[in-house]
Swiss-Prot record:
Protein name, as recorded: 4-hydroxy-3-methylbut-2-enyl diphosphate reductase
Binding, dimethylallyl diphosphate: 36, 70, 120, 214, 216, 258
Residues that bind [4Fe-4S] cluster: 12, 92, 186
Pathway: Isoprenoid biosynthesis; dimethylallyl diphosphate biosynthesis; dimethylallyl diphosphate from (2E)-4-hydroxy-3-methylbutenyl diphosphate: step 1/1; Isoprenoid biosynthesis; isopentenyl diphosphate biosynthesis via DXP pathway; isopentenyl diphosphate from 1-deoxy-D-xylulose 5-phosphate: step 6/6
Its biological purpose: Catalyzes the conversion of 1-hydroxy-2-methyl-2-(E)-butenyl 4-diphosphate (HMBPP) into a mixture of isopentenyl diphosphate (IPP) and dimethylallyl diphosphate (DMAPP). Acts in the terminal step of the DOXP/MEP pathway for isoprenoid precursor biosynthesis.
EC number assigned by the record: 1.17.7.4
NCBIfam families: ispH_lytB, PRK01045.1-1
Gene3D superfamilies named in the record: 3.40.50.11270, 4-hydroxy-3-methylbut-2-enyl diphosphate reductase, catalytic domain
Length: 277
């Protein structure tokens, strides 16, 4: 059986940057998980004493706080700045961009449409920078019964599929006099999604490695599943089952943006150890 890695996969720029910061800073607390990968979070805590707190209220004797890659709300940032604590911002620049856009556009009188998951920490943070009105949607149908203003700015969660974002944009173009469109989808998302689409079309089994609470990993899995019925989403090599690979000729592997290479290599090694010819 051939085992093939996607052309683009794994750690993105923003995650690499955040991990490096955390390793250098040490002995700190992150407000929410730094990234969406439990294994890497555990490694940071064990080796660098970087612990994860649920929220700002959980801070007690910590002297250093790291802002997660997904960012935090404007209100939480203001509260954090009032505390006697050193702040290190590991927010991905691709996430900071829609925050800045929303703040500026709402100052100019635009209402904001955010294409994304309202419960995702990134979207919560972006929405908090809107000073007018914000509509968070996952489907254009959610906009049909809303009385939309004449001036709209639209942004996307960084990990969403571009074609779905364009469905929202096309709908808004027919409804509002002025629509400002900002492409806030991360280019790593484009590359990883294109790569897994290509690989899944020629594979008869796919393994996607990443946190099951990771939005970009779930998107990769959905693309794989669309093209390859026998697709599996796992966090570690412990979840692999030999029967998945019996009678298979081509195994494709991809990984979410928060998945470190050391986990991916463990997955590959275990599949090889199954001895499927």
């Amino acid at each position: 059986m051939i085992i093939e890695l996607a052309k683009n996969y794994g750690f993105c720029f923003g995650v690499k940057r955040a991990i490096k910061k955390a390793e250098q800073i040490k002995d700190a607390a992150t407000i929410g998980p730094l990234i969406h990968n439990n294994e890497e979070i555990s490694r940071l805590q064990k080796n660098f004493n970087v612990k994860t707190l649920e929220n700002i209220k959980s801070l007690s004797n910590e002297t250093k706080a790291i802002i997660r890659t997904h960012g935090i709300t404007k209100q939480d940032l203001e509260e954090l700045r009032k505390k006697d604590i050193e702040i290190f911002d590991a927010t991905c620049p691709f996430v900071t961009k829609p925050q800045q856009i929303c703040e500026q556009m709402s100052k100019e009188g635009y209402e904001i449409v955010i294409f994304g998951d309202e419960n995702h920490p990134e979207v919560k943070g972006v929405k908090s920078y809107v000073n007018t009105k914000a509509y968070v949607v996952l489907d254009k149908k959610e906009l049909q019964n809303i009385k939309l203003p004449s001036k709209i700015a639209v942004v996307s969660q960084t990990t969403k599929k571009p074609e779905h974002f364009m469905e929202i944009v096309n709908f808004l173009m027919l409804k509002a006099k002025e629509v400002r469109v900002f492409n806030t989808i991360c280019d790593a998302t484009f590359k990883n999604q294109d790569a897994i689409k290509e690989l899944s079309l020629k594979s008869d089994v796919m393994v996607v490695v990443g946190g099951k609470n990771s939005a970009n990993t779930k998107q990769l899995f959905l693309i794989a599943k669309t093209n390859c019925e026998d697709s599996y989403l796992i966090e570690t090599e412990e979840e692999l089952k030999k029967e998945w690979f019996l009678d298979k000729k081509h195994c494709g592997i991809s990984a979410g943006a928060s998945t470190p290479d050391w986990i991916i290599q463990k997955v590959i090694a275990k599949i090889e150890n199954f001895g499927i010819n």
